Amino acid sequence: MSSKIKFVALLIVVISLLLNNAQSTREILSAEICGWNDPAVHCKTKEDCFEKCGGRPAKKVFCVRPGDHSYDRLCCCRA
């Protein structure tokens, strides 16, 4: 009985982590959060975005593709 409870608890934790990861990915790719209404800054690495992002910590600066079919990468500055 206790092994079933442990298994269910572990399953709940794993599912919640997967859902949280998917939500974070959608948030990063959101044009509203990334500020793509501003002039777009093309990048190859996140280091290319530090100046555009105005000294934000490295964990809030991204170089991402704005869409599934885009080959260009743009700077994304999270608040």
UniProtKB/Swiss-Prot annotation:
GO terms for biological process: defense response to fungus; killing of cells of another organism. Belongs to the DEFL family. One of its GO terms (cellular component) is extracellular region. Keywords: Antimicrobial, Disulfide bond, Fungicide, Plant defense, Secreted, Signal. This is Defensin-like protein 272. Its main location: secreted. InterPro entries: DEFL. Disulfide bonds join 34-77, 43-63, 49-75, 53-76. It comes from Arabidopsis thaliana. Residues 1-24 form the signal peptide. It is found in: Secreted. The lineage of its organism: Eukaryota, Viridiplantae, Streptophyta, Embryophyta, Tracheophyta.
